[in-house]
């Protein structure tokens, strides 16, 4: 597997986490996101999403195998996807959009974004596993 493809994916995942949180939370001032899911999307939770973004960037700088690191990343993304699906089943996106468009957009896309990067991390994991 081309290391450049892996690096681009890791950098993109980091950008989505860091820039996405800063943009949609309006630099941690959008309380509608916090109140829509106070456990997962508190300002602390949003900060931890950004920390995961930094971890993805750090992984892009590693020149050896990152097989088990991306496995952990895939599990992390899986957890967020499950939480997102549960949130969608128990809440109304339409109501959230009426409160704040950025919060509505955030909750509309974050799980899909995490699902896509989960698949990417799994792809890297299995490719590095088969390359041994």
Task: Place the predicted regions along the sequence by residue.
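Cytosolic juxtamembrane helix and N-cap/initiation of the first transmembrane helix
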Residues: 1-16
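Short aromatic-rich membrane-water interface segments that cap or initiate transmembrane helices
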Residues: 39-42, 101-109
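Mid-chain, well-packed structural core segment of small domains
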Residues: 64-93
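Membrane-helix boundary connector in multi-pass membrane proteins
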Residues: 86-106
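Membrane-water interface at the C-terminal end of transmembrane alpha helices
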Residues: 108-132
């Amino acid at each position: 597997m081309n290391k450049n493809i892996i690096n681009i994916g890791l950098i993109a995942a980091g950008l989505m986490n860091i820039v996405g949180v800063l943009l949609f939370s309006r630099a941690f001032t959008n309380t509608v996101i916090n109140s829509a899911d106070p456990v997962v999307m508190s300002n602390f939770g949003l900060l931890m999403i950004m920390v995961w973004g930094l971890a993805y960037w750090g992984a892009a700088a590693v020149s050896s195998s990152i097989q088990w690191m991306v496995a952990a990343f895939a599990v992390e993304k899986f957890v967020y996807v499950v939480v997102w699906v549960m949130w969608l089943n128990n809440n109304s996106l339409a109501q959230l959009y009426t409160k704040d468009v950025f919060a509505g957009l955030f909750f509309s896309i974050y799980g899909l974004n995490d699902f896509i990067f989960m698949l990417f991390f799994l792809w890297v994991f299995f490719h590095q596993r088969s390359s041994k």
